[in-house]
Amino acid sequence: MNARYRGFTIETDQSKEYGGDGSAPEPFDLFLASIGTCVAINVIVFCQKRDIPTENITVIQHDEKNPETNMREKISIEIQLPPEFPAKYRKAVIKVSEQCAVKRHIFNPPEFDIHVT
């Protein structure tokens, strides 16, 4: 299944367990990945504006799933900064990461209007 959005074609699939062939990420996997990549982009832009090298910055995301509800109960994001990263910007990196648009939409969700035509 492909989605077209703003000129991009985004491939998705379901796992074999749910009838797909596992050839592409499941839609929910893309959603989870969008959180981590959104944070990473915010960090990169922050650093670029201050001429801080970004090559050795890593963003790692983990999530905890409730086995009974199959819902994610916690998403943890670790931003690994190199030793030479300016100490005065460490807290600012967290603050800019919290401004991720994906995260903000989770906390203030849009109204959904699903209909058939």
Give the positions of each predicted feature.
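Extended beta-strand/beta-hairpin segments
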Residues: 1-33, 44-117
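Short glycine/serine/threonine-rich phosphate/pyrophosphate-binding segments
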Residues: 41
